[in-house]
């Protein structure tokens, strides 16, 4: 499989995606399922295709993705980040376009940890005056 593929690793929240790109007809396969079947929501599919639409490469590459961890939104973001990195690995000339759209930067936002004495990360226990 390593043959003539370009590779990119994408991360978002707790999801990690390994993306392999090669010249082809535009098929996107995520965990052995077509992208339309894997991501049930339209927003997830739009997020995944965003770097390809921006660079006018929607039907020029076959993409194979292995993604693990997190939920649907995090996985879609991780796949997008991986596709972006793989496209830059393939052709560095695409980087300014992708960078201007904010797709090259890894979204570093993570879930804030729950603190002791709180219900959640910031939700305090109810205060009783008496």
UniProtKB/Swiss-Prot annotation:
The keyword Cell division does not apply. Keywords: Ribonucleoprotein, Ribosomal protein. GO terms for biological process: translation. GO terms for cellular component: cytosolic small ribosomal subunit. The keyword Ribosomal protein applies. InterPro entries: Ribosomal_Su5_D2-typ_SF, Ribosomal_uS9, Ribosomal_uS9_bac/plastid, Ribosomal_uS9_CS, Ribsml_uS5_D2-typ_fold_subgr. One of its GO terms (molecular function) is structural constituent of ribosome. Belongs to the universal ribosomal protein uS9 family. This is Small ribosomal subunit protein uS9. The gene is rpsI.
């Amino acid at each position: 499989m390593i043959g003539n593929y370009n590779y990119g690793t994408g991360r978002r929240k707790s999801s990690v995606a390994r993306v392999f790109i090669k010249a082809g007809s535009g098929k996107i396969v995520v965990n052995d399922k077509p992208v339309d079947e894997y991501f049930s929501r339209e927003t997830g599919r739009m997020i995944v295709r965003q770097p390809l639409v921006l660079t006018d490469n929607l039907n020029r590459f076959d993409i194979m993705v292995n993604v693990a961890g997190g939920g649907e939104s995090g996985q879609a973001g991780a796949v997008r980040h991986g596709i972006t990195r793989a496209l830059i690995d393939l052709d560095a000339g695409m980087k300014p376009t992708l960078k201007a759209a904010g797709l090259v930067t890894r979204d570093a936002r993570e879930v804030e940890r729950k603190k002791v004495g709180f219900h959640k990360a910031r939700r305090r226990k109810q205060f009783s005056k008496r």
